[in-house]
Design a protein with these regions (language model features):
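Conserved sequence signature across two-component system core domains
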Residues: 9, 33-35, 55
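Acceptor/aglycone-binding surface of glycosyltransferases and processive sugar-polymer synthases
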Residues: 51-74, 79, 91-170, 174, ...
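Acidic helix N-cap motif at the loop->helix transition within catalytic regions
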Residues: 14-18, 39-48
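A conserved acidic beta->alpha catalytic loop
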Residues: 34-42, 87
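Hydrophobic helical membrane-anchoring modules
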Residues: 168-293
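Short, well-formed alpha-helical segments that are part of the catalytic scaffolds
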Residues: 7-25
Length: 293
């Protein structure tokens, strides 16, 4: 079986050599996607013998993952393992991550940071954010997971051939997860240990979390338009009808129009109708596209 390891990298000249050196001991093919780095990441990776994909500008984590998928497909790899380039993942965890695919027990394996108790050093804000985003992802997939944001994953050949990520940002992890679930592929998790020593993430956790959340909601709205738009639409319609009845009753009793109540009633009815129409139109479009495909 041809196992390829892919590493998305952005300005990781300090870590990339050691990571590649350790990976070449367990894999014949290591791909590094240099995502518009301004340092010597690409040169060092080439010198260490990795296949290097170079982005002229920084596309984002999702853009790098997409390039790794396409390159692994081009190389006719049987499996793609992805891990981060910041040195936080243990190379020794690669074998446990690929094992379920080797045993035909899964098509996607996620290295989860929450299946082991040795994660006390994970920043609390990160732990809370990851769990919230994971809960959101779990609301739209069949096999629930504990760590939807882990970059340490293994993808089987079926996934490589049938799924191409489209997100450029960090939302790609949930995008892939939802697409994998929708196609009926099997998802498994194994415990991994991550070191947060010297964690130098420059991303604002709030903007990062908001970006991933919005991306996830976008895919949920496309996959489940009736639930996402239709149910809130019905709720707003019901609220609008209640306020409309209150307006009519008030006018009957006092011969005066309760302006505030009337505005709320009309506004919520209009908004609810728009949501319902959106759900029906989007549902029809999505089904039409699926039938053509």
């Amino acid at each position: 079986m041809k196992i390829t390891v892919g590493v998305p990298a952005y300005n990781e000249e300090k870590n990339i050599a050691g990571i590649i050196q350790n990976l070449t001991e367990i894999s014949d093919t290591v791909i590094v996607c240099d995502d518009g780095s301004t340092d010597n990441t690409a040169k060092i990776a080439e010198k260490m013998g990795a296949i290097v994909i170079t982005h002229e500008r920084n596309l984002g984590y999702g853009g790098a993952i997409r390039s790794l998928f396409l390159k692994a497909r081009e190389l006719e790899s049987d499996m793609l393992v992805t891990l981060d380039s910041d040195g936080q993942h243990r190379i020794s965890d690669v074998l446990p991550v690929v094992e379920p695919i080797l045993k035909n027990q899964a098509d996607l394996v996620i290295g989860s940071r929450f299946l082991t108790e040795n994660q006390e050093d994970m920043p609390k804000y990160r732990k809370i954010g990851i769990k919230m985003i994971t809960s959101l992802a779990n609301s739209s997939i069949e096999d629930t997971v504990s760590d939807s944001q882990s970059g340490f994953r293994a993808y089987g050949k079926n996934i490589l051939s049938e799924i191409t990520p489209s997100e450029n940002g960090m939302g790609v992890s949930n995008e892939i997860l939802m697409k994998v679930s929708k196609k009926g592929f099997k998802i498994a998790e194994v415990p991994i240990i991550v070191s947060y020593e010297g964690d130098t993430s420059t991303q604002n956790p709030i903007s990062h979390g908001a970006s991933v959340t919005l991306s996830t909601l976008k895919f949920i709205s496309i996959d489940h338009p009736l639930k996402f738009y239709g149910l809130p639409g019905l709720v707003f319609l019901a609220i609008g009808l209640v306020f409309t009845v209150m307006t009519i009753q008030g006018f009957t009793e006092t011969r005066q129009i309760l302006l505030g109540t009337a505005v709320i009633g009309v506004g919520t009815i209009i908004f609810g109708t728009v949501l319902l129409m959106t759900s029906i139109i989007l549902y029809s479009i999505v089904n039409l596209i699926r039938e053509k495909n």
